[in-house]
Amino acid sequence: MEIRIERGDILSQSADLLVIASYEGEDYQTAFMKRLDDILLGKVTKMAKMNEFEGKPGQFMLIPAPDGMAVEYVLIVGLGVMGSTTLESAREAAGLAVQTAKKLNLKSVVMEFF
């Protein structure tokens, strides 16, 4: 399995699974999250409003990517309270991404540097 860590415009990356970090209580109205939500046809805010995802450690949302996106799936992982991310919580989030990719039989993962 190919795993890449990227900085910059993560939404333009190509892979089977795109991993995005989210923080507890995060405002989904930031420019980045609005863009992601637009690309994913409103699914991010819909799930957040339903309280299915709050950005807590261990929480995740797996969203099939729409046509035209260079990935098959987007995985949004919770990292907890912003500023409290530790090496261990980042490792757990990365592990969750790899486990998800294995379950889906995916060959490549790209994640933002968190």
Functional labels for PLM-detected ranges:
Residues M1-F114:
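Glycine-/small-residue-enriched capping loops at alpha/beta junctions
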